[in-house]
């Protein structure tokens, strides 16, 4: 046993050499973009056909939003954030 063999250096118990990663980072969600356009205000079929309102034109501003969107269902109003 007079061989002069060299033994490798003892392996270190430090684990992998890649840097340790922290917790996952979440991206901030951007505002939702609807594929369809939001509904337009105004009641369908509302205009000069009201007695006593002749001459005012069909550009009638509706004060109550429920009247402005009476042709829509509640889930449609909620989808676009109207209610």
Swiss-Prot record:
Organism: Homo sapiens (Human)
Keywords: cGMP, Hydrolase, Sensory transduction, Vision
Catalytic function, reaction form: 3',5'-cyclic GMP + H2O = GMP + H(+)
Identification of the protein by name: Retinal cone rhodopsin-sensitive cGMP 3',5'-cyclic phosphodiesterase subunit gamma
A GO biological-process term: positive regulation of G protein-coupled receptor signaling pathway
UniProt note: domains: The C-terminal region is important in conferring inhibition.
Oligomer status and interactors: Tetramer composed of two catalytic chains (alpha and beta), and two inhibitory chains (gamma).
Comp. bias intervals (Polar residues): 1-17
Annotated family: Belongs to the rod/cone cGMP-PDE gamma subunit family.
Ranges where the record places region Disordered: 1-51
